Amino acid sequence: GMIRHGVVISTPHYMTKSGPRTKIDPELQEQWSGFDMQNALSKKLEMPTRVLNDAEVHGAGIISGSGYEVVITLGTGLGFAIFYGGSLSPHIEFSHAPVRRATTYDTWIGEHERRRLGNAFWSRRIRAMVDELRPVFMWDRLYIGGGNARCIRQADLDRMGDEVVIVPNAAGVAGGVRAWTLEQYK
């Protein structure tokens, strides 16, 4: 979801009672919109907290701190984060961008589609997505992580370019620690 300075702007998966790909509950949508998650957690836990999305935490654990670095996480849907010079850039809810046949990236490359297509076809789809996004973002380095990154075939990875790196899902743990020193946009 989209979080700015610990405040929820949008969180599509928590606005439904039954999880992803189900109907949005207007009452939950209203309750989450503008919710200061970071402050609420700090008060409840009686300690400082930092609230980021999954791709931002993942990226905190892997970025080099040099240049324009993009992080994509593949799981239930698509996580997305941008870092420039080691600083976290404002969030883009790229997963909700339309991609094909009036569908979003979340749906087009998410877990449901991976299971439906099988890993080989899904992996080619990821390669096509990377090829299409390269001229838009012109990253110095693209990191692909998340639970489904392991499903990308080596043949497809080899065709993505040297600036594309698959990173382990465990990077999120290191990112959780490093997030405390991560510079953010103002």
Task: Go through each PLM region and give its residues.
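Solvent-exposed alpha-helices and their adjacent loops that cap or buttress functional pockets
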Residues: 43, 62-66, 71-74, 134-136
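Structural motif
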Residues: 49-50, 68-71, 81, 141-142, ...
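Adenine-nucleotide phosphate-binding core of ATP-dependent small-molecule kinases
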Residues: 101-143, 147-186
